[in-house]
């Protein structure tokens, strides 16, 4: 599957490195500075395109990718700095490791958001807000919640458009859940949002409920904030004040801007209809499955929600975690359908700028000193080892 947008080329190759987040010196292609009107080739599954071939949307996609490449260049340098003293900055997951690594006999089940009780939903949102009051581990002028957004926007960006997209985010979710437990006393499991249940009317999903959900769209008629969005004014996260948007330090309200191309307040559910999900799950190889999940399902939702979700700092929005848990859920289901062959199937391009198909189970997932770097092999089976969960 062809990548859409600009590429960043490396002026030196990482010798012997297979690490997501390795930060070589970059040069940005001069064409990346242009926001052309060329049509993007449609990415299709089934009989209808997942994304509409529209010049306005093309411009937004290209602009989004160009801006984030500049952000990655800056964060690349920081990724080295963050590794200098990991003894004082590394986020601990020891509590979970001690309880789960030695034996994982009864892995708990991650449930769909609507399967949680009212009390469990409130406990989850309380813990998320709590994390936004814990001081930054990286010494940023923000909180631990902001650290996770910076982690994804910098180191995590190297996993996009590559085979490491699914395993890198799987472990990042685990680390985030561990932080909720350690710092905020969270005693549940990360839920997932099964958007296939809402495909006929995504904008009115119960996930956006102001009482038992994540709050809804940005304020109708309110001022534009970031990512063509507006401030979220209902729900449990109205007090969140992220400190960055992509490469820019700008404290702002949590912002969303539901849209279906030029139609505001609406979100197209076509990419998430059941027959599309069925086709994705029938992909025979890991490489094809990963590409379908990321380039279709993942990207389509980021564009539909917009606001904070339009940038690589999308983890500013708590919906990021239940969205990515759903993609992890789909991967888990795909693995279970043929455990003998798929449980440890991992190949393709390990990093988005890899020059060849270098991915292996020994390839490292790197987190820039935020938490321990681990080989891909440690996150392939969620029901054994340190992860210890199922869906």
From Swiss-Prot:
Tagged with keyword Acyltransferase: no
Glycosylation sites noted in the Swiss-Prot or TrEMBL record: 97, 141, 204, 246, 261, 353
Entry membrane topology: Single-pass membrane protein
Pathway assignment: Mycotoxin biosynthesis
Main location: membrane
SUPFAM superfamilies in alphabetical order: Di-copper centre-containing domain (SSF48056)
Enzyme Commission number: 1.14.18.-
Disordered: annotated segments: 1-21
Pfam families in the record: Tyrosinase (PF00264)
InterPro entries given in the database record: Di-copper_centre_dom_sf, Tyrosinase/Hemocyanin, Tyrosinase_Cu-bd
Listed cofactors: Cu(2+)
Cofactor note: Binds 2 copper ions per subunit.
Molecular functions (GO terms): metal ion binding; monooxygenase activity
Enzyme type, top EC level: oxidoreductase
Keywords noted in UniProt: Copper, Glycoprotein, Membrane, Metal-binding, Monooxygenase, Oxidoreductase, Transmembrane, Transmembrane helix
Transmembrane listed as a keyword: yes
Phenotype upon gene inactivation: Abolishes the formation of phomopsin A and related metabolites.
Binding site for Cu cation B: 298, 324
Subcellular location: Membrane
Function: Tyrosinase-like protein; part of the gene cluster that mediates the biosynthesis of the phomopsins, a group of hexapeptide mycotoxins which infects lupins and causes lupinosis disease in livestock. Within the pathway, phomQ2 is involved in the generation of the common 13-membered macrocycle, possibly by catalyzing the hydroxylation of Tyr.
Family recorded in the similarity comment: Belongs to the tyrosinase family.
Name used for this protein in its record: Tyrosinase-like protein phomQ2
Species for this entry: Diaporthe leptostromiformis (Lupinosis disease fungus)
Lineage start: Eukaryota, Fungi, Dikarya, Ascomycota, Pezizomycotina
């Amino acid at each position: 599957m062809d990548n859409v947008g600009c590429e960043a080329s490396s002026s030196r190759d990482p010798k012997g490195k297979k690490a997501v987040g390795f930060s070589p010196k970059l040069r940005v292609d001069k064409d990346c500075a242009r926001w052309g009107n060329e049509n993007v080739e449609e990415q299709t599954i089934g009989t209808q395109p997942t994304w509409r071939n529209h010049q306005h949307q093309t411009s937004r996609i290209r602009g989004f990718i160009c801006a984030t490449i500049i952000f990655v260049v800056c964060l690349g340098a920081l990724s080295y700095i963050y590794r200098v003293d990991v003894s004082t900055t590394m986020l601990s997951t020891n509590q979970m490791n001690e309880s789960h690594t030695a034996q994982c006999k009864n892995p708990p089940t991650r449930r769909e958001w609507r399967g949680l009780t009212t009390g469990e939903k409130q406990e989850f949102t309380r813990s998320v807000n709590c994390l936004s009051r814990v001081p930054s581990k990286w010494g940023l002028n923000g909180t631990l919640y902001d650290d996770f957004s910076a982690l994804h926007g910098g180191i995590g960006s190297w996993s996009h458009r590559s085979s490491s997209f699914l395993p890198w985010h799987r472990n990042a979710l685990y680390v985030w859940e561990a932080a909720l437990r350690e710092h905020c006393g969270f005693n549940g499991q990360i839920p997932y949002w099964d958007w296939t249940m809402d495909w006929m009317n995504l904008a009115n999903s119960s996930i956006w409920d102001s009482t038992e959900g994540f709050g809804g769209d940005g304020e109708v008629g309110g001022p534009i904030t970031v990512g063509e969005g507006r401030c979220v004014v209902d729900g449990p996260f109205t007090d969140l004040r992220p400190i960055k948007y992509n490469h820019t330090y700008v404290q702002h309200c949590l912002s969303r801007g539901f849209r279906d191309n030029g139609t505001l307040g609406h979100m197209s559910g076509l990419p998430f209809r059941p027959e599309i999900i069925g086709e994705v799950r029938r992909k025979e190889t890991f490489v094809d499955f990963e590409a379908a999940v990321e380039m279709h399902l993942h990207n389509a939702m980021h564009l539909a929600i917009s606001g904070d979700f339009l940038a690589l700092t999308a983890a500013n929005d708590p919906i990021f975690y239940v969205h990515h848990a759903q993609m992890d859920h789909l991967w888990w289901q795909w693995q279970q359908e043929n455990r003998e062959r798929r449980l440890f199937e991992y190949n393709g391009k390990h990093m988005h700028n890899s020059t060849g198909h270098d991915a292996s189970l020994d390839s490292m997932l790197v987190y820039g000193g935020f938490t321990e770097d681990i080989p891909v092999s440690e996150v392939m089976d969620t029901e054994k080892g340190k992860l210890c969960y199922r869906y």
